[in-house]
């Protein structure tokens, strides 16, 4: 991933990577590998935004309102795990993760576990 990309290009790649991950076919080894790479790419992109575009955090946080391909969930995790954030942004990101944790799909359990670990670390 090139570090000299514009903020807009990075966010576009982030959203495309979320789509790739969302569309994983777990019966297809190549699809899983591609999806895992997309997840790694999103983490790298979040790190690049944090490093090179820290003034764009508010703009990045608007992804918390985009549930398409679970972009909101990815952004919430990356804001809390990688970026510097305000208490209000922390609350917004946590509410996104809590919403997914309350569902009855395969991502809910992972998000419930993540929230438990997060809360334990915050004590």
Protein language model regions, located:
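Residue-level detector of extended alpha-helical repeat arrays and alpha-solenoid scaffolds
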Residues: 35, 39-42, 72-73, 108
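Residue-level signature of alpha-solenoid helical repeat scaffolds
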Residues: 12, 77-78, 113, 117
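Amphipathic alpha-helical repeat scaffolds
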Residues: 15, 46, 61-64, 77, ...
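Mid-chain, well-packed structural core segment of small domains
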Residues: 61-90
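Short inter-helical turns and helix N-cap capping residues of alpha-solenoid HEAT/ARM repeat scaffolds
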Residues: 67-68, 103-105
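Amphipathic alpha-helical scaffolding segments comprising HEAT/armadillo-like alpha-solenoid repeats
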Residues: 11, 53-63, 87-98, 123
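Short terminal alpha-helical segments
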Residues: 3-40
């Amino acid at each position: 991933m090139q570090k000299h990309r514009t903020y807009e290009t990075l966010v576009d790649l982030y959203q495309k990577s979320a789509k790739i991950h969302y569309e994983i076919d777990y019966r297809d080894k190549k699809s899983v590998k591609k999806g895992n790479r997309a997840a790694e790419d999103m983490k790298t992109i979040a790190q690049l935004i944090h490093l090179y575009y820290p003034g764009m955090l508010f703009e990045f946080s608007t992804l918390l309102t985009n549930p398409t391909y679970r972009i909101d969930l990815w952004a919430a995790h990356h804001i809390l795990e990688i970026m510097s954030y305000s208490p209000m942004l922390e609350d917004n990101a946590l509410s996104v993760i809590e919403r997914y944790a309350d569902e009855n799909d395969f991502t809910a359990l992972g998000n419930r576990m993540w929230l438990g670990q997060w809360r334990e670390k915050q004590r």
